[in-house]
């Protein structure tokens, strides 16, 4: 009888251990970079960053640069990262978007004032069910799991608007117009292989001779 009880206890222990291991989060690693810094997503869902940090892009609560990878604060179970703007962005496994950093100033760098709050990841509660984000300077796009695309200004991230006329989108990409830091354009790929573009059309960025609509 004692052996039977011990056997049951051991079997139960093994099952519980298996369940714990099965629930351990795992995601596909990725890296995103711009001219100043890099974000790396590990398979365990943590985010690591290195490079210039004067705008808080590393997400460590300070403006201290880092020669070596440091872990971004407060993020777990992340599935996507984006480092294209001075604002860094990430998407977690629940589909929420996180952002941190400060917009690049047109004034001299020595006048930049960065708070710990700006340099620490914050969640955007106005949108969820997101699977991918992209940014180019001030503006950002979020692709939801239902194939719709949403836009927001990084200065007011809780004011999220749906991009009309798009559905069944599988990939999004934003670009900055060469020679004008305030002009942007966006592209989207739908499930049928069609490419959609909008925004500024300087130098025919949208692949058409027609004027675009500024973001």
Task: Please provide the spans of the model-predicted regions.
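Sec-dependent signal peptide recognition
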Residues: 3-8
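Short glycine/serine- and acidic-residue-enriched loop/turn motifs that recur at repeat junctions
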Residues: 41, 48-68, 98-124, 150-164, ...
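Conserved core positions of repeat-based scaffolds
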Residues: 37-40, 49, 87-90, 99, ...
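Beta-strand-rich domains and repeat architectures in extracellular enzymes and scaffolds
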Residues: 27-41
């Amino acid at each position: 009888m004692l052996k039977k009880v011990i056997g049951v206890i051991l079997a139960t222990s093994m099952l519980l251990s298996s369940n714990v291991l099965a629930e351990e989060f795992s995601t596909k690693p990725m890296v995103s970079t711009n001219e100043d810094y890099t974000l790396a997503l590990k398979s365990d869902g943590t985010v690591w960053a290195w490079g210039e940090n004067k705008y808080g892009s590393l997400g460590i609560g300070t403006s201290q640069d880092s020669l070596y990878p440091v872990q971004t604060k407060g993020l777990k179970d992340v599935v996507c990262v984006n480092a294209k703007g001075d604002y860094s962005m990430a998407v977690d496994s629940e589909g929420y978007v996180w952002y941190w950093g400060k917009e690049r100033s047109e004034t001299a760098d020595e006048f930049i004032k960065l708070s710990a709050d700006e340099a620490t990841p914050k969640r955007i509660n106005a949108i969820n069910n997101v699977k991918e984000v992209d940014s180019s300077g001030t503006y950002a796009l979020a692709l939801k799991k239902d194939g719709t695309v949403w836009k927001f200004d990084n200065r007011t991230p809780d004011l999220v608007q749906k991009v009309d006329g798009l559905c069944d989108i599988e990939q999004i990409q934003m670009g900055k117009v060469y020679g004008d830091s305030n002009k942007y354009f966006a592209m989207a790929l739908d499930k049928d292989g069609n490419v959609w573009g909008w925004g500024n059309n300087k130098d025919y960025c949208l692949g058409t001779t027609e004027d675009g609509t500024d973001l």
